[in-house]
Amino acid sequence: MFDVFRLSCLDYLIWLRSGKDAALGLNCNQATVSRNAKSVAEFLDLDPCKLEGEWSLSGDLSLLNAERKVHQLYRWAYGKSMRIDAVYGVGSDYLNELRQPWVCGPSNFLNVSYPLALLRESILDAWLGCYPDVPVDDDEFVVINLTRYPSVFLVDQQHPLLQRKVELKLDDLQDFPVLSLPDGAFPKICLLY
């Protein structure tokens, strides 16, 4: 129904949440992304809406999702532009060295629901997450452990937690946030499924 490029314009716009980033990922200009995304949405009688930095579509998505499945099978079968992304703080270690056919996202998801929705809708092909947020194996997703070693908490020798006399628990770490994000870097509202 749609050629790979036209549907990719819509999907990259939804995935990357920016016409500029979608254009960079597809090696074209923003006007081309916008025009193609709009034509797909109009053809399927869908209403695109950007709310708090994230794109969503309203209307009957059944035909679009079927078309996405076909395009995803094509990407998998022919190794074409397979899309991968990650939760904030995880992706750079794994994704920096990936080469074609992988297309890497910005690894700026702070929630689980949005990337899982992108996986369900065949917009993403793979996503790197962290426990306990990743789903258990089910009919829809396969979880592949990339490391068998636990994460550790590293601090400076002068950190206040080292002054405690009792064994540390995970709750003790909550008073010391580790992410430093610029204002407005991420949407305030996430998609729920």
Where are the regions that the model predicts?
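N-terminal hydrophobic or amphipathic helices and topogenic motifs
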Residues: 1-110
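Short loop->beta-strand "edge-of-pocket" segments that line small-molecule binding or catalytic clefts
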Residues: 78-88, 167-188
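Structural motif
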Residues: 84-90, 110, 129-132, 156-158, ...
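Structural motif corresponding to alpha-helix initiation and N-cap regions
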Residues: 112-113, 167
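Short beta-strand-centered segments that line the small-molecule binding cleft or hinge
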Residues: 113-155
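Flexible hinge/capping segments at coil-to-helix
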Residues: 146, 150-151, 155-178
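Conserved small/polar residues in nucleotide/adenosyl-binding loops
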Residues: 193
